[in-house]
């Protein structure tokens, strides 16, 4: 029998809610009467091209998430729930090690981005299969200034080639796992997964994300997310 490779998604949901004014994981804050992370899982759960979901959660949260979210909402594709690490890259690495061995493509997505669309997910998989790595991003709208330590402007880059990076970040599984296996101390400053590949000289493609694909980190973001969901329901 032919071995059919899998497409997996790692949902990183280990962040705290300090900027939300909460002392617990922001992923469990209610968005239209459902936890934020439940909205995120649901998008991937409903896609035929996604075979398994790996959840990375905060320390001591595995059983809570299993009983309060996975069982309550009946998610079937969640194959593993693992605890995160000290930094985001540690959490992602834990997730990568929990992925099925027959995985060919892996998406890494923020649990706090529940407004991701299926079109972006599908395009990211196609591009990653062809190129090895791609990220969703949107062109920056504001002028960006680079300063020195004295808060003096030293350069104003052209906006034409500046992108605000989102998730999913999608990779050929063997490629991103190898990159994480060979992390160097300098990679500790990496703020996204693509940077770890970039450090090894790999090319990372960009696909257009969406300005609605926000990461919910503040109370204001929650209000915006509720309005976006309302607009989608009403077909506006």
From Swiss-Prot:
UniProt key word DNA repair: no
Catalytic activity line of the entry: 2-C-methyl-D-erythritol 4-phosphate + CTP + H(+) = 4-CDP-2-C-methyl-D-erythritol + diphosphate
Domain of life the protein comes from: Bacteria
Biological or metabolic pathway of the protein: Isoprenoid biosynthesis; isopentenyl diphosphate biosynthesis via DXP pathway; isopentenyl diphosphate from 1-deoxy-D-xylulose 5-phosphate: step 2/6
Keyword Cytoplasm: no
UniProt cross-references to InterPro entries, sorted A to Z: IspD, IspD/TarI, IspD/TarI_cytidylyltransf_bact, ISPD_synthase_CS, Nucleotide-diphossugar_trans
MF-aspect GO terms: 2-C-methyl-D-erythritol 4-phosphate cytidylyltransferase activity
EC code: 2.7.7.60
Family: Belongs to the IspD/TarI cytidylyltransferase family. IspD subfamily.
Name of the protein in its database record: 2-C-methyl-D-erythritol 4-phosphate cytidylyltransferase
Organism: Alkaliphilus oremlandii (strain OhILAs)
């Amino acid at each position: 029998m032919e071995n059919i490779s899998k497409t997996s998604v790692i949902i990183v949901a280990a962040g705290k809610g300090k900027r939300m004014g909460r002392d617990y994981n922001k992923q469990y804050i209610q968005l239209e009467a459902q936890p934020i992370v439940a909205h995120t899982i649901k998008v991937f759960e409903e896609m035929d091209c996604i075979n398994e979901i790996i959840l990375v959660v905060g320390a001591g949260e595995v059983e809570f998430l299993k009983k309060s979210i996975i069982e309550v909402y009946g998610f079937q594709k969640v194959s593993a729930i693992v605890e995160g690490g000290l930094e985001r890259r540690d959490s992602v690495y834990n997730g990568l090690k929990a992925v099925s061995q027959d995985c060919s493509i892996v998406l890494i997505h923020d649990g706090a981005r529940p407004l991701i669309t299926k079109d972006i997910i599908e395009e990211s998989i196609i591009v990653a299969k062809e190129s090895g790595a791609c990220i969703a991003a949107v062109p920056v709208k504001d002028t960006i200034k680079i300063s020195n330590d004295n808060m003096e402007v030293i350069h104003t880059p052209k906006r034409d080639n500046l992108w605000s990076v989102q998730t999913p970040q999608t990779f050929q599984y063997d490629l991103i796992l190898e990159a994480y296996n060979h992390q160097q101390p300098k990679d500790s400053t990496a703020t996204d997964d693509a940077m770890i590949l970039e450090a090894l000289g790999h090319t990372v493609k960009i696909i257009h994300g969406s300005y609605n694909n926000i990461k919910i980190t503040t109370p204001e973001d929650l209000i915006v997310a509720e309005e976006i969901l309302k607009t989608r329901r009403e077909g506006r």
